[in-house]
Amino acid sequence: MRSRTYSTAFPAILSLILTGGFVACYLANRSNARPPYRTHRARVAAVPQAPLCGRPNDEQVHIPPNWVSFVPPARGASYADPVFGCTIVRLTDALQEGVAEHHYYATLTPMSADDSKILIVNEHGAWFVTDLVGGIVVPVTKMPATNAGTVLWDGTDGNVFYYTKGNSLMKGTIRGKTVKPSLVHTFAEYEAVVLPDKTDLSINGKSFAMWGGTAGGTHPLNIFTYNMQANVKKTPYVTGCVQNAALTQGSCVHGITQTADNNVIIDFANDGKCLECGNRLWDGNTLVHLQDTTNHTDTGLDLNGNPIFIAVGNSSTLAGLKNPCPGGWGLDVRQQNNISSAVCLLDRQPSWHVSYRGRASQPWAAISFFDDRKPGPELFNKSPGFEAPSSRNWGLYEDEILLARVDGSAIYRLAHARSRSAESYWAQPHAAISRDGKYVIFDSNMAYAQTGCPSGIADCSDVYLIRVQ
């Protein structure tokens, strides 16, 4: 079910990783299955905490107008999505900067806790911070040196983020246009620790999912969660397979995702029924099978406070599972500790990325869609195989960004990303929701649809923002 495809710029990006740079070799983890579906209708008309914009509970195919000719505004300016009505702000300009820029991955929170700043990384692995109209808050030259891996915002302080350096977890505090580094904890038992792909700070803002090990060669990984307030490191899972702990992924582990109860889902590099295959939940004692055949996943709490994960689950992902959606392949919200209990979130979806920071006070998940079929409409205008969108080749939810209420009761379709996702992995929107659910941030290469990527810029894309609450 999962195919792992590399960016077109993978060889160069891999080289950067090996020097502690950009973690952009992130592999696509997705389903290509497209069986027949039956319509799944959202069940309530009035929704508490309804978004500010978007089209609710609509199951019609909407082709984006001016797909071939649309040009987004300059950095800092905005436009209204012509189909769904949400206002979209452009935050970056790869052509002007001479480098592609991304908010990174859907399961990470790019927005600060006070909704004032955005963390962005360029294709060379350099992080920087902007405001909500793309103005530079902290330039690349003032950011601290970090290990390979991610940079994570604090859960409450909008001026604080975390990163790793050597075998230490570090705190960065923004002061004007500079950053003051300070030590959170040194893991003396390891040569290197990493905040790898996919994993964000915990919902309660206290805990990190990490791994540690040797910085050179290939050895077992120690995968664990660390609570910085209690200064408690949970019992690590020590892998039987091996890879370099200083890198963000390898032939052993593809990534890790922290759960809402501060445990960790380990996404092993290979699918299958073996112990170190698929997605396995490490609770400090045992490895629990969540998926043998994996797909894009994120975690949080349901409205009753139960830890959940959002993914497609059925007998193809784990023997004995049933999918609650009419089509049998829909996105579901599944209880982490009772995986037979699930509700349908969305049916008939294309390939997706999901982002959830939620609980009862923030019940919305952001979902973005992409397609890499060739020929097709999600290619640059001048690329071989490009086809203008039509009723023949444009699918339900294609290229869209939407919000789904975690109890399955409502869908709000926000915008077309207008990204030509078939061009590369980093052209996929990877929409991410802010911790408080007020903003959605996504990537798009829409500015280059007519011309293709500028010379010297690989996987060209820019970052865009939608306010939804």
Model-derived segments and their meaning:
Residues 55-90:
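Blade/loop signatures of beta-propeller domains
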Residues 97-104, 189-195, 243-252, 350-351, ...:
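Short glycine-/Asp-/Thr-/Trp-enriched loop segments that recur within the blades
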Residues 98, 105-107, 122-166:
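Blade-loop segments of beta-propeller domains
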Residues 108-117, 122, 149-159, 164, ...:
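Blade-terminus and WD-like Trp-Asp/Gly-His loop motifs, strongest in beta-propeller folds
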Residues 125-129, 167-173, 216-225, 272-282, ...:
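Structural motif
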Residues 145-221, 233-248:
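Asp-box/WD-like beta-propeller blade repeats and closely related beta-sheet repeat scaffolds
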Residues 340-419:
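Loop/turn-rich, solvent-exposed surfaces of beta-rich toroidal or solenoidal domains
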Residues 427-469:
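Blade-level signature of beta-propeller repeat domains, shared across WD40, Kelch, NHL, RCC1
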